[in-house]
Curated annotation (Swiss-Prot):
Protein name as it appears in the record: Polyribonucleotide nucleotidyltransferase
Domain (KH): residue spans on this chain: 554-613
Transmembrane segments: none
Cofactor dependency: Mg(2+)
Species in which this protein is naturally found: Vesicomyosocius okutanii subsp. Calyptogena okutanii (strain HA)
Gene3D superfamilies for the chain: GHMP Kinase, N-terminal domain, K Homology domain, type 1, Nucleic acid-binding proteins
SUPFAM superfamilies xrefs: Eukaryotic type KH-domain (KH-domain type I) (SSF54791), Nucleic acid-binding proteins (SSF50249), Ribonuclease PH domain 2-like (SSF55666), Ribosomal protein S5 domain 2-like (SSF54211)
Cross-referenced HAMAP family: PNPase
UniProt-listed Enzyme Commission number(s): 2.7.7.8
Pfam families: KH_1, PNPase, RNase_PH, RNase_PH_C, S1
Function: Involved in mRNA degradation. Catalyzes the phosphorolysis of single-stranded polyribonucleotides processively in the 3'- to 5'-direction.
Length: 695
């Protein structure tokens, strides 16, 4: 057993990398630790490419084991079930970072597994997972170009915080994860509280500087392990075939990419591709396969579009580099929903619906760092059905992409939501992508803002989002505003920014190349701000503040009762509160502090529930007159029900000014009489009838 270990300090944390003790049959295996948080990272790759493989089959799976925090799973089977949203998002985070570092043409299957085996309640495992993946890939021998580093950045009181703890993040205006190589940033994922572009860019630069120590130590660790790289040779380019496609079909391809409508353009490109295959397949003595012709046809497509952009020709749909596509904005189009909006930007369209529910509808989330489940009162779900791109497909489980896009849109909105105390609803927003041609997640941000305001949610400010792109060849580059799907596919960067007129709420960046500069990011942020303000201006012309007159908005309130009245409200075995719910058809929840939350979609139902709760929990007032029912006669007086579950004693001496020998001579059970509360003694109610009678 040849164990190798490397330790270094990163900010306030101690990072340790170890290999040679666990999972020795994997091609690369590292036990990575950040303080007491430990993850086991394994890398396995097939030595050969599958026949006909035309894509890079990289899979990254981040798995949180409940035993890592001394817990047993709560499911019936007592095993970890399907991936949580956190696991899916972390898997995507790492995948997006490492994918650009594999060489073009490498098609061997690679599986990366990250297992959290010990979790500290203060340290998020995602950063150490990223560093562990970097180390495991570096020692595995696969053609992974260079180590990566990653760090989380917070921002509080005008200062950046490196790898903040969970507690520090609660007081931070920024939660940003940045990853990249020693030369460039490859990935950014962030959520912010309306911060300026300058602060956001400064955080990216700060993170890049801080994770250099990790890259240096991972490189040294790789050298110490001494793993040999695979003898992988990149496929040789068929220059003759590439030249033939350019010469024979280049002009047609260039012309096709001037067709503005996506489906028409794709149909024309498909026709040209089929013509190229028919003309060039088996043309030379070695024979060109249809797959090979199609492969190089895509290369010509890519170079054609990129050259047009770099030469400052008009873009595919005729726009210049800084123009946002035409917008069409509608609200309230679904008549029986609480709030709705249809946001259309060019050929991208999102139908966004807001639903308001009681606090009891909150999503319960289990987290490694928390011993108790936490309530999530804001949900944003993103759906991408196949029809939105003119295709058929299976409607199976939620895809990773849908989870990721929904999370990004949620991050763009969260900073502007009211607190649960200010707005005691569970809010669910669903974005149905009904058409897609680029930047559907940012359309979801815009549609969500509109839909929330239509539902009457008092958001702090309208929010809009925009996706930026990049085409770069050597020193030439062009930043594109509001990219199309083809520009995203054929370009070098996907840079998404969401925020208000005051600042940035969310920033996500994915890079396909390794030479993104500070200047490029600065230009992208500047253009994104201009576009965001433009979109907000058009959105504000349709709706700029919450719709307080929406008749579909549910009614809710919180009534504060004394804690000793909780049992009166609940009743024996829940009989009282169940009766109120059944009678009023409202939703009612009460907590241990005496907060009673009443919710209903109907005004009459709501009013009935409120009155019934007040009646049951009301406290009699001294000197107030009540009309009560005689419920029991005793020798020393009578018990009078003056409120629901509230009986008071009318003493025989308080029935009349005259001497009363027998109570039944004056009142009988079932009689309704007026009485006055003359005293409260340790919960006992003292009543008088005679004070209301003339002497």
């Amino acid at each position: 057993m040849n164990i190798k270990t490397k330790s270094f300090t990163m900010g306030k944390h101690i990072v340790t990398l170890e290999t040679g003790r666990i999972a020795r049959q994997a091609h690369g295996a590292v036990l990575a630790s950040m303080d007491d948080t430990q993850v086991l990272v394994t890398v396995v790759s097939s030595k050969e490419t599958r026949p006909g493989q035309d894509f890079f089959p990289l899979s990254v799976d981040y798995i949180e084991k409940t035993y890592s925090t001394g817990k047993i799973p709560g499911s019936f089977l007592k095993r970890e079930a399907r991936p949580s949203e956190k696991e899916t998002l972390t898997s995507r985070l790492i995948d997006r970072t490492i994918r650009p570092l594999f060489p073009n043409g490498f098609m061997n299957e690679i599986q990366v597994l990250i297992t959290v085996v010990s979790a500290n309640s203060e340290v998020n495992p995602d950063i150490i997972s990223m560093l562990g993946v970097s180390a495991a890939l570096s020692i595995s021998g696969v053609p992974f170009s260079r180590p990566i580093g990653g760090s989380r950045v917070g921002y509080s009181n005008g200062e950046y915080i490196l790898n903040p703890t969970y507690i520090e993040l609660t007081n931070s205006d920024l939660d940003m994860v940045v990853a990249g190589t020693d030369e460039a940033v490859l990935m950014v994922e962030s959520e912010a509280n309306e911060l300026s572009e300058e602060i956001m860019l400064g955080a990216v630069v700060y993170a890049h500087e801080q994770y250099q120590v990790a890259i240096t130590n991972i490189a040294e660790f790789t050298t110490e392990v001494g793993m040999q790289k695979w003898d992988w040779i990149a496929p040789i380019t068929n220059e003759v075939l590439l030249s033939d496609i350019k010469s024979k079909f280049g002009k047609e391809i260039n012309k096709a990419y001037q067709i503005k409508e996506k489906l028409d353009r794709h149909a024309k490109i498909d026709n040209i591709r089929m013509a190229a295959i028919e003309a060039l397949e088996n043309e030379n003595e070695n024979g060109n396969s249809a797959e090979e012709v199609s492969k190089y046809f895509k290369e010509v497509e890519k170079s054609t579009v990129r050259e047009r952009i770099l030469n400052n020709d008009s873009r595919i749909d005729g726009r210049n580099n800084e123009t946002v596509r035409e917008l069409k904005i509608e609200t309230g189009i679904l008549k029986n929903t609480h709030g709705s909006a249809l946001f259309t930007r060019g050929e991208t369209q999102a139908l966004v619906v807001t639903t308001l529910g009681p606090k009891s509808d909150a999503q319960l989330i289990e987290k490694l760092e928390s011993p108790e489940r936490q309530n999530n009162y804001f949900l944003l779900h993103y759906n991408f059905p196949p029809y939105c791109v003119g295709e058929t497909g299976r409607l199976a489980t939620i895809k990773r992409r849908e989870i990721g896009h929904g999370h990004l849109a949620r991050r763009g909105i969260t900073a502007c939501l009211p607190s649960i105390e200010e707005f005691p609803y569970t809010v669910r927003v669903v974005s149905e992508i009904t058409e897609s041609n680029g930047s559907s997640s940012m359309a979801s941000v815009c549609g969500s803002s509109l839909s929330l305001m239509d539902a009457g949610v008092p958001i702090k400010a309208p929010i809009a989002g925009i996706a930026m792109g990049l085409v770069k060849e050597n020193d030439r580059f062009t930043v594109l505003t509001d990219i199309l799907g083809d520009e995203d596919h054929l370009g070098d960067m996907d840079f998404k920014v969401a925020g208000t007129s005051r600042g940035v709420n969310a920033l996500q960046m994915d890079i396909k190349i390794q030479s993104i500069t500070h200047e490029i990011m600065e230009i992208a942020l500047k253009q994104a701000k201009e576009a965001r303000l433009n979109i907000l201006g058009q959105m504000n012309q349709v709706i700029c503040e919450p719709n307080t007159s929406n008749k579909n908005t549910p009614k809710t309130t919180i009534i504060k009762i004394k804690t000793d009245k909780i049992r009166d409200l609940i009743g024996r075995g829940g009989e009282t509160i169940k009766g109120i719910i059944s009678t009023s058809c409202a939703s009612i929840d009460v907590d241990d502090s005496g907060n009673v939350n009443i919710f209903s979609n109907n005004q009459k139902s709501f009013d009935t529930a409120v009155q019934m709760v007040k009646d049951v929990t009301a406290i009699p007032e001294v000197n107030k007159v009540y009309t009560g029912k005689v419920v029991k006669i005793v020798e020393f007086g009578a018990f009078i029900n003056i409120m629901p579950n509230q009986d008071g004693l009318l003493h025989i001496s308080e029935i009349s000014h005259e001497r009363v020998e027998k109570v039944k001579d004056h009142i009988r059970e079932g009689d309704k009489i007026d009485v006055k509360v003359i005293g409260l003694d340790r919960g006992r109610i003292k009543l008088s009838r005679k004070v209301l009678l003339e002497k």
